[in-house]
């Protein structure tokens, strides 16, 4: 199911150009809500601006005294120039056992896994040990101003009681040789820092 959802989400162009000219996240948000409603989960689209849509769903846990866990992804993607690709970046072609296209790694695949797990929770009437908040944000690729940042500022109650959060899978594993053998080992890198931004004004006299 996660593969199906990944491919269907990838075929929805949600390129974020940073200037408001993109197709917006609304179609992807509507897709998410449709997949949830199909299994009886009520979900609402929340817009920071017309078209800049996010979806947040809370699943009640068995012990409401425990801090809730936020599992979040983003629906927008970095723009893709078809001339730079060997496949249509929004076709979600399945080839060589992999799905090719924009969003396969960053991060519609995780969005799909979140959705698939939500659908399973609903179908099997699973009650998690603590509250789970699943969030599908807009605007991550341009700083989250119209997505996560806006929701936390304008709808903080959506995240009441949450104490941890996990997210971003915009990376990939690497294959490393095993010393003294012909074997290889797959390594999954762990991020220990986050990129930042600093403005520097330089003046040089020649």
Give the positions of each predicted feature.
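Acidic/histidine-rich catalytic neighborhood of metal-dependent amide-processing enzymes
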Residues: 105-192
